[in-house]
A protein has these predicted regions:
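Alpha-helical transmembrane segments and their immediate interhelical loop/hinge regions
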Residues: 1-72, 76-82
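Hydrophobic alpha-helical transmembrane segments of membrane transport and translocation systems
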Residues: 80-158
């Protein structure tokens, strides 16, 4: 049982680290793209989205709406263009970067990260999205260790 607790602690710590790395990547993507496209408040929006992205899935959306209204005060046309930029960057982040970065940090293949977020979100909402990635990772790791031990016992080591 001690092994399970140590494993869960290590995986949850890695998950938090992965979330932070992913948030910095997303904020940087917004800062760079907004600077290139000459949007107002690029640095502020990048930092805002980085902080709100710590909340899985919906955090970026919250940051987007705050940034949208901020940009709307300066330029309504750029605010609408910002929504398009947000959709593009959010798709890249949600489908490519998030599963790879967070999955890599907890030792879970990207497809299982998407399964964990979907399952956790459907069962327990936002809290489930936070809890299910480390939980599925612990189960995945324990199952993998059990399979490897059985294969080793039968001298069928991969």
């Amino acid at each position: 049982m001690e092994h399970v607790w140590k494993l869960a602690n290590r995986i949850f710590s890695s998950f938090i680290t992965g979330q932070c790395i992913e948030a910095v990547i997303l904020g940087s993507m917004f800062f760079v793209s907004m600077t290139i496209l000459r949007f107002p408040y690029a640095m502020l929006v990048g930092i805002l989205i980085a902080f709100t992205a710590l909340i899985p899935v919906f955090g970026g959306i919250i940051g987007c709406w705050v940034a949208f209204f901020l940009i709307l005060m300066v330029s309504p046309v750029k605010a609408v263009l910002f929504l398009g930029l947000f959709l593009i960057l959010q798709q890249i982040e949600g489908n490519l970067i998030y599963p790879h970065v967070v999955g890599g940090s907890v030792g879970l293949p990207s497809i299982w990260v998407l399964v964990a977020v979907t399952l956790g979100g459907s069962l327990m909402g936002i809290v489930g999205m936070l809890i299910f990635i480390p939980l599925i990772s612990v189960i995945y790791t324990l199952f993998r260790e059990w399979v490897y031990a059985r294969l080793e016992k039968k001298q069928l080591v991969l």
